[in-house]
């Protein structure tokens, strides 16, 4: 690996870690917007919030009647909301997004109070005191967070509906991989931002709109954003299930083998094939992922907005999805950036799908 590529990977890694440290539980994506802006706003010509909370960053190409190219990666992360404050400093919660309750016990969390952040741990029953077989996964409303405060102290600091998230963490592991929380989908958001920011303006074939969309893990709010933006064409960027022992090969992708490009009945086949051809020509490693119907990402919502927005779905391989120890390959993140950059500089795609002007 040449030094220049390694330097770029290190820059990208820092952005991934910085973004993943921001609290953005579904419904609270704007909680640390000022920190987000301090990280990335200077790399774009403008930024704004739409009516539902999607955060858009714009880089203009400087050409008249240029196509609008949308890059979507969701900003929200899985987490919890407080549902009950109990005696003894305990809190009951409900989940926001899919959480594996089997990994929650004894994990450390942060409760984002009115004026301060409180630390807690999800209470765990010692094995020798547990009843039953121990094989049943606890339900989310059966778990309690221990804060060590009194009920009265808690009620002065938090309320029902207060968000609770996993404590920020990041670890470098072997073979150029890193582990941490909310890489789904902050790692992809970082790749979209980095690719748009570092691609020379004169190489862009259209104005690039990076949309950090909200609430993908729950209902999804990208559709109103895509409708309002009305891009000429779009790329949805999300994580894909990383292959580990016991998983099906046809349902997963390998880490360190490049990003995935999805073949689906509901995304644009021609745009997908053109991206695959571009990846081949530029010798960008990629994997094919097959999702016959719904992709499980924002791609479908974008594709179905307005009269239909041509959309391609790409993925970053990720292991231990929806846990606080998600694993990604740094080599995959840089390769994903290469693929995104190729997408926003591809003249053939722009000629085929670019509508010009406002995309009308």
What are these regions (language model features)?
Residues 1-360:
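N-terminal hydrophobic/helix-forming segments and targeting peptides
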């Amino acid at each position: 690996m040449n030094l220049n590529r390694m330097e770029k990977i290190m820059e990208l890694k820092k952005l991934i870690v910085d973004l993943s440290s921001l609290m953005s539980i579904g419904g609270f994506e704007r909680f640390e917007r000022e920190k987000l802006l301090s990280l990335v706003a200077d790399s774009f010509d403008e930024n704004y919030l739409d009516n539902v909370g999607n955060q858009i960053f714009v880089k203009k190409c400087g050409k008249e009647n240029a196509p609008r190219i949308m890059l979507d990666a969701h900003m929200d992360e899985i987490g919890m909301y407080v549902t009950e404050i109990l005696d003894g400093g305990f809190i009951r919660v409900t989940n926001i997004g899919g959480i594996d309750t089997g990994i929650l016990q004894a994990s450390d969390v942060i409760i984002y109070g009115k004026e301060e952040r409180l630390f807690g741990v999800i209470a765990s029953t010692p094995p020798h005191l547990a009843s039953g077989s121990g094989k049943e996964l606890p339900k989310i409303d059966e778990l309690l967070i221990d804060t060590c405060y009194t009920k009265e102290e808690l009620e002065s600091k938090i309320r029902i509906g207060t968000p609770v998230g996993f404590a920020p963490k990041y670890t470098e592991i072997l073979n150029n991989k890193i582990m941490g929380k909310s890489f789904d989908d902050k790692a992809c958001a970082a790749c979209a931002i980095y690719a748009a920011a570092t691609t020379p303006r004169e190489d862009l074939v259209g104005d690039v709109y990076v949309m950090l969309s909200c609430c993908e893990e729950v209902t999804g709010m990208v559709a109103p954003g895509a409708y309002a933006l009305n891009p000429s064409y779009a790329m949805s960027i999300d994580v894909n299930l990383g292959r580990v022992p016991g998983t099906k090969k046809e349902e997963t992708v390998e880490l360190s083998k490049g990003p995935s490009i999805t073949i689906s009945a509901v995304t644009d086949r021609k745009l997908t094939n053109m991206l695959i051809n571009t990846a081949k020509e530029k010798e960008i490693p990629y994997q094919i992922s097959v999702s016959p119907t719904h992709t499980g990402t924002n791609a479908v919502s974008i594709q179905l907005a307005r009269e239909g927005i041509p959309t391609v779905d790409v993925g970053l391989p990720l292991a231990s999805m929806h846990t606080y120890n998600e694993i990604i390959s740094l080599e995959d993140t840089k390769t994903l950036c290469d693929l995104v950059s190729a997408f926003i500089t591809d003249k053939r795609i722009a000629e085929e799908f670019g509508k010009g002007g406002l995309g009308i």
